[in-house]
Regions:
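Radical SAM enzyme core and accessory elements
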Residues: 2, 55, 374-377, 387-494
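Residue-level recognition of beta-strand->loop/alpha-helix junctions
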Residues: 4, 34-38, 200, 291, ...
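Flexible glycine/acidic-rich beta-alpha junction loops that bind and position SAM and/or redox cofactors
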Residues: 9, 96-97, 191, 241-242, ...
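Glycine-rich beta-alpha loop elements in corrinoid/cobalamin-binding modules
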Residues: 17, 21-152, 372
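Radical SAM [4Fe-4S] cluster-binding motif and immediate context
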Residues: 157, 162-328, 333-335, 348
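Catalytic cores of alpha/beta
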Residues: 97-103, 337-352
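Glycine- and acidic-residue-enriched helix-capping/strand-helix junction motifs
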Residues: 8-18
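Nucleotide-activated donor-dependent transferases that construct or modify glycoconjugates
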Residues: 1-9
Length: 494
């Protein structure tokens, strides 16, 4: 049995990682059963009932709130089947394998890419063989942790296709309002951003599927399951721009129509000609998410993100606007070493982009310190408190961490400045869509005091924010994958 705890945010589609694991273990003769907490409200009852016949229980988990439900599910399994092996995998157990394995309800850790490792673990468990020397596996023997070396990543094209036949697409369609699917054409990114877990997990290695394989499989999936949208979960889809345009050309020439979205960096998008960006749009690309993070060159250097140029942020927005592609720019505030002047510079530049390009929206986030990232030792020196148990990490969700280098006053001003920036941006876009000149002028008048607040950093008595919150109108965060609204509240102004 494979379990995916419910994730913080909107559901987009089935858990791709578990589908990949299911396909691999099925090739070894095991029958996978997937429980997705996002679509199964009573997942603890389902697990308690279905685990009675299970050979093992596996959980894939990210750092943050998912951990809470992972622990609850593990305790249910321990109670119902005390002897059943409980296997943890995914980002968090890979980054903190030892701490995770110290928990009484965790028996085995699958580190990094898990398809081959999990298959080997289950085969050995079925014959009673030892897990010694199983690459990519840590486990407990007589209460002591045994560590094996990591398994080299397998080329994606060498792994079996995820078990999409196990998906009840109707249940996801009811939740999402459409027939959507996450899909990985590649994993890994060659950049060295020091806040990114991807760099630790994949060691800066780009691991793509073949163009022909991707085109063939996606077209098959779209036609077989009547899909409306494919969200590519690649870390940085445009690493190989020739490959990206070849995929787009393959989709376009097939005659099969569907929307698709991806994430990338603005410098790579700017390597494409306007005609190539237009090709992306013609093939179905409706949205691109960019990890712009900051408009302060000084902070970008601290992030080891010098490839990110301010001019590229404007040019990427222009290219996408001209092609008719929506764009979301992710922003990170509260980074170590960031000062008020850096934040003001970011909001100033992003305000210019917002005024010039109506296709651009923003998703500002408070810096989230994930374990094991390259900058981690510096964070501890700066006073960050590291949770000492698996359960402690459940409260470290996106934008929820306490950052000791950010004072209470600075945090309050940051929250309000972000909210005012987003409110101005949202009102401006709303005004541009109004047909009535009178309505447009009225909206522009309402914007003026908000611009004044941002310019002078005057955020006392934020009555405009309270009003917008009361109407549940202000969008604060968006999905980098699709641009869809994720959050409508900032904690400070509730």
């Amino acid at each position: 049995m494979l379990f995916s705890p419910p994730y913080q945010g909107k559901v987009f589609g089935p858990p791709l990682g578990l589908l990949s694991l299911a396909s691999s273990i099925r090739e070894e003769g095991f029958t996978p059963v997937i429980v997705d907490g996002a679509t199964t409200p009573n997942f603890l009852d389902v697990i308690s009932r279905e685990v009675t016949d299970a050979f093992a229980f596996g959980i894939s988990v990210l750092t943050g709130p998912m951990i809470r439900d992972a622990i609850a599910a593990s305790r249910v399994v321990r109670q119902v089947r005390p002897e059943l092996p409980i296997i943890y995998g995914g980002w968090h157990p890979t980054l903190l394998s030892g701490q995770t394995l110290r928990e009484s309800f965790v028996d085995i850790i699958v580190r990094h890419q898990g398809e081959k490792t999990l298959s080997e673990i289950l085969k050995r468990q079925s014959t009673g063989a030892s897990l010694d020397l199983v690459a990519g596996c840590w486990f407990k023997r007589d209460g002591k942790i045994v560590t094996n070396g990591d398994r080299p990543s397998s080329p994606l094209s060498s792994l079996p296709s995820p078990a999409y036949d196990l998906v009840d697409f109707e249940s996801y369609a009811r939740l999402t309002g459409g027939r959507k699917l996450p899909y990985a054409t590649s994993i890994g990114c060659p950049y060295a951003c020091n806040y990114c877990t991807d760099m630790v997990f994949y060691n800066r290695r780009f691991n793509p599927q073949t163009v022909s394989g991707v085109v063939s499989e996606i077209l098959h999936l779209v036609k077989t399951y009547r899909l409306d949208e494919i969200a590519l979960v690649d870390s940085n889809f445009l690493v190989d721009t020739r490959r990206a345009t070849a995929l787009a050309r393959g989709f376009l020439e097939s005659g099969v129509r569907f929307r698709w979205t991806f994430q990338a960096s603005t410098d790579l998008l700017c390597r494409l000609s306007d005609d190539e960006v237009a090709l992306l749009a013609s093939s179905g690309v409706s949205h691109i998410g960019f990890g712009t993070e900051s408009a302060s060159p000084e902070i970008l250097r601290k992030m080891h993100k010098s490839h990110q140029k301010i001019d590229d942020m404007f040019e990427a927005a222009r290219k996408c606007r001209d092609a008719g592609i929506r764009v979301t720019y992710n922003l990170i505030f509260g980074y170590p070493g960031e000062e008020d002047r850096h934040r003001r510079e970011t909001l100033r530049v992003m305000g210019q982009i917002a005024a010039k390009f109506e296709n651009v929206t923003f998703s500002p986030n408070l810096f989230t310190p994930y374990p094991g990232i390259p900058i981690w030792p510096e964070l501890l020196e700066a006073g960050l408190r590291e949770p000492q148990s698996l359960e402690g990490w459940a409260s470290v969700g996106l934008g929820q961490a306490e950052l000791p280098w950010l004072s209470a006053r600075a945090s309050e001003e940051l929250s309000r400045s972000i909210s005012y920036f987003m409110l101005v941006n949202q009102m401006s876009k709303g005004a541009s869509k109004m047909r009535s000149n009178v309505s447009r002028k009225a909206m522009r008048l309402l914007e003026k005091p908000l611009h004044w607040r941002l310019k002078h950093h005057a955020f006392a008595l934020p009555i405009e924010l309270w009003a917008s919150m009361a109407q549940n109108w202000l969008v604060v965060r968006r999905s980098l994958l699709t641009g869809d609204a994720l959050g409508r509240q900032m904690k400070e102004v509730q």
